[in-house]
Amino acid sequence: PMPNIRTIKNFTTSGLMLSPGYGGGTANIEYQALTGMNLANFNDSLIVPYQQLVPNQSDPYSFNQIWTQKYGESATTAVHPFQQSMYLRNIDYKKFKFSYLYTCDSEEPLTHTGTIDRSPYVSDSEAYQNVLDLINEQKDSDKSQFLQLVTMQNHTPYGDYYDNNEFVEADTSENISDSERNDINTYAKGVNYTDQETADFLDQ
């Protein structure tokens, strides 16, 4: 379902990442990506760093601070098309020294929040457009910027969200429940949308 991304990988620097989860609970993966800290280094009692660790740290490190140190506090911005309090991101991103976290319910909310068909989540196309707006705001500046985007389009649960889902007919999986089959079909179509939307985003 992702031919564009696979093609892009063949023509640029790319690799594989072993993810400890998908579709949900991704705040832990987000924490590891932003800080470089593997959760395996912590005690097993640490389940969600965003809720248990970062709010209690006085000066936690994250990679975006490289930009903050060089270009000033306005050089790093985050976008998450959901609620700001989820996983305490509104607290944690301030700790990480992001200048602003744009969410659906932030004081200055996201402009683009459209969905696809019956999906309850903001589409990746809309999420990318919010990022493009931030890029275009700074296009005449000589300062580099760090933009963090955490999307929601392919988050669980996977209902019957999409019309004209070609993966329903293509699914030949055996020995799975109807619920599992529906999850697979919806996830595959969501990834397919992400694939096209990512290609469109990079073209811009």
Language model segments and positions:
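Solvent-exposed soluble domains appended to multi-pass membrane proteins
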Residues: 1-204
